């Protein structure tokens, strides 16, 4: 809101994201115990555009931000799996993501513009383009999971993950009312197959899946934590004559404070 109590409006859009290429290795150090590690190369580009204007006045301020991102991070983990009888197995794992860094090559342009009813922009004046380089931390993360099940019959398990900080601001995602805090998640789920080898009933060979999850995203908007929770249901539909499935999933959930 401006000094004369005129309400400003803002339009925002963005494009891009972060990609990952990875290489991993694992080794069984005991009959029931394995360890592994992988290295991830993260890369991508994110572009955002925002237009701030006063309604019914066909002029405003446009800001364009571009960030070219690249960097490495590492994961290490270990897994234990053992049979408690002829059919039932138990398993557990611990994974740790080592804190890494993303190097961001930033470009920022601020312009005065006019616009039409379709918000097509025409540049009137432009400030000097800003270019700089920043480093963004990829926070460390610890996750622990455990489960129990029978091969090709049923599995039930859960996972807990914790991260001290969910992220950092950069030019492309700066907002006055947005901050970042701790991340945490809890999930439970499993699957059930009535009869994997049934030749008489298709329904008995279907994989029935379900799960619950709760996630504290770490994103803070107007000092309110944004949480994500959901119920998931799914089916694995076997293709006759093959070892392949068609997987269908459904999710009912809530994200945010409303």
Predicted regions mapped to residue ranges:
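Outer-membrane beta-barrel porins/channels
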Residues: 1-258
């Amino acid at each position: 809101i401006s000094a004369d109590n005129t309400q400003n409006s803002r339009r925002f859009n963005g494009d891009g994201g972060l990609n990952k290429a990875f290489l991993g290795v694992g080794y069984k150090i005991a009959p029931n115990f394995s360890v592994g590690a992988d290295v991830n190369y993260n890369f991508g580009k994110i572009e955002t555009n925002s237009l701030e204007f006063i309604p019914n006045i066909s002029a405003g301020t446009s800001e364009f931000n571009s960030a070219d991102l690249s960097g490495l991070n590492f994961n290490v983990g270990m897994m234990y799996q053992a049979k408690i009888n002829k059919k039932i197995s138990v398993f557990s794992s611990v994974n740790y993501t080592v804190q890494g860094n993303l190097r961001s090559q930033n470009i920022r342009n601020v312009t005065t513009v006019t616009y039409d009813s379709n918000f097509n922009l025409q540049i009137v004046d432009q400030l000097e383009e800003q270019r700089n380089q920043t480093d963004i931390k990829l926070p460390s993360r610890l996750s622990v999971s455990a489960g129990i099940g029978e091969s090709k019959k049923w599995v039930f398990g859960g996972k807990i993950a914790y991260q001290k900080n969910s992220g950092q601001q950069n030019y492309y995602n700066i907002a006055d009312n947005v901050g970042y805090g701790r991340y945490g998640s809890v999930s439970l789920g499993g699957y059930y197959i009535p009869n994997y080898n049934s030749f008489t009933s298709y329904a008995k060979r279907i994989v029935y899946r379900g799960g619950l999850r709760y996630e504290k995203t770490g994103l803070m908007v107007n000092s309110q934590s944004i949480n994500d929770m959901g119920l998931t249901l799914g089916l694995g539909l076997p293709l006759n004559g093959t070892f392949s499935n068609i997987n269908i999933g459904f999710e009912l959930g809530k994200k945010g404070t409303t």
